[in-house]
């Protein structure tokens, strides 16, 4: 699943090609995504100029003067910038054709993503309005985590992946941040001290910044806007490395299910 670094990589790749461009045509080949593509999407977008491309959590926001298109990649989605003459392939569901001969193509093999439209403030949309702070913002720090963790019995990894606590920290990056902070994923969130949460918040910021700098992580489907895979996979310390040596102490990495998701950690380094 594309996580925050992959979505931010896409935003940075797409923005120079679409900002300031007018939408000439919208082609919907298959509207059957997680939520159906609105039937009036073409009417809403055609003739509009894309004023800005923003990211909120794992959502991309394409702002125009009259409304905002909201894109989520689900499990396997991606956006590509292509010449308008490039023929669509299987799973290429929507094209947004621009006035310079380019198009923005939404591909989603598993169809768990979405492309929606709102004329209101997108931050008030039901999918966005209850989200927690951005992890790379000043609003996210150890104090924020410690305050919300009081009385929580959930594992700290599950707590960290809760979008109401902080957005965009998916499974890959939660595992990596906990390893950097030397915290065991199954420790109860309510028993983590403020000092340890300070370390964890800083580790989250560092992991996400490193991943963005490397274009995200490609495990299966993710490609950036120019068709390139992400390279952060080469830097993974624990994720998907069960039985391999911890980069810090050489102890074999362990794996288990924590909160219905896969967890990877070093039993010696992380406590």
Per-segment meaning from a language model:
Residues 1-113, 261-265, 270-271:
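A cross-family signal for N-terminal binding/gating loops and helix N-caps
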Residues 1-4, 135, 139, 193-201:
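Generic detection of long, well-ordered alpha-helical segments
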Residues 69-168, 173-180, 188:
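Phosphate/anion-contacting hairpin/loop surfaces
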Residues 20, 47, 130-133, 182:
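Glycine-centered secondary-structure boundary/capping sites
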Residues 38-44, 48, 65-66, 83-89, ...:
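Short, glycine- and charge-enriched coil/turn segments that flank and shape catalytic ligand pockets
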Residues 22-40, 54, 146-271:
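Basic, nucleic-acid-binding surfaces and adjacent catalytic neighborhoods in DNA/RNA-processing proteins
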């Amino acid at each position: 699943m594309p996580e925050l670094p992959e979505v931010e990589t896409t935003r940075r790749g797409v923005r120079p090609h679409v900002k300031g461009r007018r939408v000439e045509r919208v082609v919907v080949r298959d509207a059957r995504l997680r939520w159906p593509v609105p039937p009036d999407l073409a009417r809403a977008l055609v003739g509009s100029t894309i004023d800005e491309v923003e990211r909120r959590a794992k959502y991309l926001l394409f702002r125009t003067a009259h409304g905002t298109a909201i894109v989520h990649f689900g499990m396997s989605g991606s956006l590509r910038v292509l010449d308008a003459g490039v023929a669509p392939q299987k799973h290429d569901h929507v094209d947004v054709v621009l006035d310079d001969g380019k198009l923005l193509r939404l591909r989603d093999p598993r169809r768990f993503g979405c492309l929606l439209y709102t004329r209101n403030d997108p931050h008030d949309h039901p999918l966005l309005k209850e989200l927690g702070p951005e992890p790379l913002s000043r609003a996210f720090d150890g104090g924020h985590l410690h305050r919300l963790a009081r009385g929580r019995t959930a594992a700290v990894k599950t707590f960290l992946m809760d979008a109401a606590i902080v957005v965009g920290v998916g499974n890959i990056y939660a595992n990596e941040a906990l390893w950097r902070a030397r915290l065991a994923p199954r420790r109860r969130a309510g028993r983590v001290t403020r000092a340890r949460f300070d370390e964890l918040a800083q580790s989250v910021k560092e992991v996400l910044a490193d991943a963005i700098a490397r274009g995200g992580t490609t495990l299966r489907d993710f490609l950036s806007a120019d068709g390139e895979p992400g390279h952060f996979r080469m830097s993974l310390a624990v994720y998907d490395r069960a039985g391999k040596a911890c980069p810090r102490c050489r102890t074999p990495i362990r794996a288990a299910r924590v909160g219905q998701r896969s967890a990877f950690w070093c039993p010696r380094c992380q406590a």
